[in-house]
């Protein structure tokens, strides 16, 4: 018998709290928007799902990805950078969607819920995450017995592969990529004879599993192209380059981008990645050169335009940044990454009304970056709207888990909001404990 929907929701929230203790959840509008667009596109083939799917990137070099209770799916930066094409990443996500839609984890977890959902969440996090963090997460004498029953069986893997294959075909993506990405994960054993990639510890693999996928691919050779798949595939090299440049070792990333450019001197993702690294190092002249080359080879890439605009902003050239961002927003007015950079440009120009307008708009597009609340607090303060400034600083600290500072700012906001019934109600609501998983 599987967990009830309510139980799985609670377990999912507890699980997410464990993940946040041990890992950095990537906060990047472009990366989060892209991974959720991909995930939601792939999940369209699932007819019934009791939970909204949410996709997260964890900053960690491990070759790992996993589905957690309550519809959350986590992908590690290390696995993203090992994939070369969208279909390889999609294959991993579709496999995890298969586990979710078949309720594999829910059925296994139900057997252990007698120990309490909070304790179970910790054990489950250790099982799925693996690696050095697992030992710290899994505690208590009951863990060992329960730990083994939480791993997926070979039958679970077979069913998830079959479902994942179906989702890949529905999305118009090559299901054969399931074999190529599994081969890459298998090769991850180079880390050492006693160190198996975390993904393989919870997802049994082997020649039989790969042969089954290969057979399915040969039996269903025809594949219909879909426009959204083509759009996502076109953006993928820039998504991967961003992950590699901003969230992996920069020296390794530089070598990778230079090798890519050596193979293809007109590699826009290669120059884009180098530009991001040099911007991080505050070498704006070199960053500008690389990003301008990327723009020359990919003039319609929103990612490259945003990268160049952010470099302009960082180097104090806000007017050029604003002009470039407005071009991006002409094509997609809800581009969160472009809006965030644009708001920062207006802040640096002391045009705080414009900055506030954009940041308030960004609050309507979850997940909301923590620094949206911080920056709103700054701009409201500059406008002498102090109750709103303290209110947003309160939210910033609440999201960071610092309830002492959060209460200080919420109380200050309450003092300054006498007579404003709507604002006082918002403050009272904000003073309630933070819902898990936000």
What positions do the PLM features span?
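Catalytic Zn2+-binding segment of zinc metalloproteases
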Residues: 87, 97-114
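Terminal, low-structured helical/coil segments at or just beyond the last alpha-helical repeat
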Residues: 382, 391-438
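Active-site recognition of the HExxH zinc-binding catalytic motif
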Residues: 75, 91-99, 103-104, 160
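Extracytoplasmic and endomembrane cell-envelope/extracellular-matrix remodeling and assembly machinery
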Residues: 1-2, 13, 25, 33, ...
């Amino acid at each position: 018998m599987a967990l009830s929907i309510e139980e799985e929701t609670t377990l999912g929230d507890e699980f997410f709290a464990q993940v946040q203790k041990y890992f950095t959840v990537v906060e990047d509008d472009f990366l989060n928007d892209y991974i959720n667009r991909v995930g939601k596109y792939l999940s369209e083939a699932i007819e019934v799902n009791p939970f909204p799917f949410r996709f997260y990137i964890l900053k960690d070099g491990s070759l790992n990805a996993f589905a957690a209770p309550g519809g959350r799916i986590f992908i590690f930066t290390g696995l993203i950078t090992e994939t070369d094409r969208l279909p390889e990443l999609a294959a991993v996500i579709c496999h995890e969607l298969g586990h979710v839609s078949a309720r594999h984890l829910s059925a296994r977890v139900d057997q252990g819920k007698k120990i309490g959902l909070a304790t179970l969440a910790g054990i489950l996090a250790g099982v799925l995450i693996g690696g050095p963090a697992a030992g710290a997460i899994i505690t208590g004498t009951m863990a060992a017995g329960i730990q083994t029953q939480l791993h997926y069986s070979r039958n679970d893997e077979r069913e998830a592969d079959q479902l994942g294959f179906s989702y890949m075909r529905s999305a118009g993506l090559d299901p054969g990529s399931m074999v190529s990405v599994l081969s890459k994960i298998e090769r991850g054993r180079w880390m050492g004879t006693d160190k198996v990639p975390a993904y393989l510890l919870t997802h049994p693999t082997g020649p039989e599993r790969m042969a089954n996928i290969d057979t399915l691919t040969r039996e269903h050779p025809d594949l219909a192209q879909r426009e959204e798949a083509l759009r996502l595939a076109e953006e993928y090299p820039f998504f991967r380059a961003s992950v590699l440049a901003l969230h992996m070792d920069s020296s390794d990333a530089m070598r990778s981008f230079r090798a890519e450019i050596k193979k293809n001197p007109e590699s826009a993702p290669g120059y884009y990645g180098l530009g991001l690294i040099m911007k991080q190092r505050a070498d704006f002249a070199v960053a500008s050169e690389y990003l301008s080359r990327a723009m020359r080879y990919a003039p319609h890439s929103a990612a490259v335009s945003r990268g160049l605009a952010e470099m302009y902003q960082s180097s104090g050239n806000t007017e050029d940044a604003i002009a470039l961002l407005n071009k991006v927003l002409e094509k997609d007015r809800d581009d969160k990454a472009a809006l965030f950079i644009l708001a920062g440009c207006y802040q640096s120009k002391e045009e705080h009304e414009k900055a506030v307008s954009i940041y308030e708009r960004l609050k309507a597009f979850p997940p909301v970056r923590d620094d949206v609340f911080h920056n709103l607090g700054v701009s409201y303060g500059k406008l002498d709207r102090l109750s709103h400034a303290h209110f947003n600083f309160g939210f910033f600290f609440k999201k960071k888990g610092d309830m002492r500072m959060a209460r200080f700012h919420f109380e200050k906001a309450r003092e300054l909001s006498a007579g404003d019934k709507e604002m006082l109600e918002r403050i009272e609501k904000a003073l309630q404990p933070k819902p898990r998983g936000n």
